[in-house]
Each structure stands twice: as structure tokens, then as C-alpha cells.
Amino acid sequence: HMKYLFLVIALFIGPVCMAHSDENFIKSDLFGNLGERDKAAILIIHFGTTHDDTRVLTIDAINAKMKEAFPGIEVREAWTSRIILKKLKERGVERLNPTQALIQLHEQGYTHILIQSTNIIEGTEMKELRREVEGLSLNFKDIRVGNPLLYAPEDYAVVVKAITEAMNQADSCLLYTSDAADD
């Protein structure tokens, strides 16, 4: 198991060097600040998939967990991959991109939006999402974008611990891969 632990740690050394700190964040309760006429929603941002079986096990499962964790708050989704959105549209399946979803939420009277992406790192996809949100932020009283899974240095330690514990309980080998990021 030590060689697997070493591999996991090695995989995370590079990204840890790019981690961010929380110095620029102010903690406050988005949903606790709602007025009588305010409406809140959570918008989950996914890259997307064209495979229904995969979607059920991943995206739909995440959405369901979010709805369970935040009862009484509207939970929506948006997908970022233009290629996937195009392929789905050709099959007659409509999904919204983040801009479309935010416009729809605004038109439906939502005032407070929490956006959480399923991206792993603060890379190109997250930067693009933050730009899109910034362009529409004046439509809402409060709109916030949550950090990706691996953002601050301590996030890496939590993930390495979870992976290590999962490996210790597994009877099989686990393979970890990463998509290259140019930033």
C-alpha cells in the first residue's frame, strides 16, 4: 500500500503548489440573509456527459445529494461542454449552459444564487465560469461561486486522506488519472 500512497502524494504535489488561500474570502450565510420576497437557488455546474448510464451514477447522484442537503432551496444544473450540449441537442435533449441557466433563474425571480461547480481544480473551466457569472451578477442581489474541490492547500490533505482510507478498505487496485490543465 505504501507505493500507492506515494503515487497519490506524487500526483498531488504539483497541483498543491498552485493552491490558493482563503485570504480574500469573507464568510457569510447566503441563505440566512434572505428577505421576505427573496428567492434562493443553487446552480450546480457540470462539464456534462452524453452517456445516460454515467449521468445517472454521477451528475444525477450529485444533484440528488445537493437537494437532500438543502431542502427548501431550488436546485438546478447547467452544463459547460459545448460539444456535449450540441450532441444532446441532436438527440432532442435540451440542457442549459451556465449563462442560460442564470438568465432563466433571473426571469423566474430568483435573487440569491449559490453556484457550485463539480470541477476539481481552479483551472480554465473555473475561470471561464467566474467570468460568465461576473457578467450577469447585477441581475441578482447576491450571487456566489463556490470553490472547486482542490482549491486551498488543506483541501489536498483532506482528499489524500479520503483516498488513502478508501484504498485501505478496497480489495482491488485503484487507478487515478488527471486531465492536463494548461494553467
Where are these regions (language model features)?
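Glycine-rich, highly charged phosphate/nucleotide-binding loops
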Residues: 91-104
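A structural feature that tracks compact, well-ordered secondary-structure segments
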Residues: 46, 80, 89, 94, ...
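Conserved small/polar residues in nucleotide/adenosyl-binding loops
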Residues: 176-181
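Hydrophobic, ordered structural segments
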Residues: 102-156, 160-166
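Short connector loops at secondary-structure junctions
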Residues: 73-90, 150-151
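Sec-dependent N-terminal signal peptides
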Residues: 5-13
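Boundary at the C-terminal end of the N-terminal hydrophobic targeting segment
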Residues: 19-21
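Extended intrinsically disordered, low-complexity coil regions enriched in Ser, Thr, Gly, Ala
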Residues: 52-78, 126-138
